[in-house]
Amino acid sequence: TTNSLVEISDYLYKKNPEGASTIINQLERKYMGHVEELYNTEEWKEKTRNFLKEQFRYLRSFTKTHFTSFEEKVILAEGEIISTNMVTNYLLESGINAILLPALEMIRTDKNAEPDFHYITEKCNHYMSENAGYQIYITQGFICRNAYGEVDNLLRGGSDYTACLIGAALQADEIQIWTDIDGMHNNDPRFVEGTQPVRQLHFAEAAELAYFGAKILHPTCIQPAKFSG
């Protein structure tokens, strides 16, 4: 999806709305197909279809306006917005008491494009206290607003960074980053067979491994957890 959204933006930068519309149509058909595969009841299929129609109508609106980096960031945010809504609907249909909390209302950067941790802490705790009692809380990764209230992104670390910021803001006991291997290993499993996970690392050691290429974790993800202890 992200590649398609980047492609849409590229077409619009090149003043080719027809090319952008073609990709938007392809992406909409893809997601409408997912609706048929994912949901069992017509009620939730229809609810999700209506949501998707609204989002893709919004995407098409960018083919008729002047296109800048601001619009590009809004378009790139749609992947997270669509996927988290679909997952939340799936959980609700399955009888799981889940709620979607909007990252664009909780995650903000300051004028230096760094996470505004005071704001993030205040908003995350507010939304959690206002919505207590749910089994599962879902939010978007990577996307945020900047100091001027515009849709933006965290630039580095992606969704992992968002998870660490929220975990630190809520003073969580544990932050889990799910990937294709179980933790940081004693060697790079892409090149060495039979590697073993390292059971315990200091923040500085984890940050150094990430900095020197441990793909499991972006170096910036260490800082929020270290800051909150």
Mark where each language-model region is:
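Nucleotide/pyrophosphate-binding catalytic subdomain
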Residues: 1-222
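Acidic-aromatic/histidine active-site loop/patch
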Residues: 225
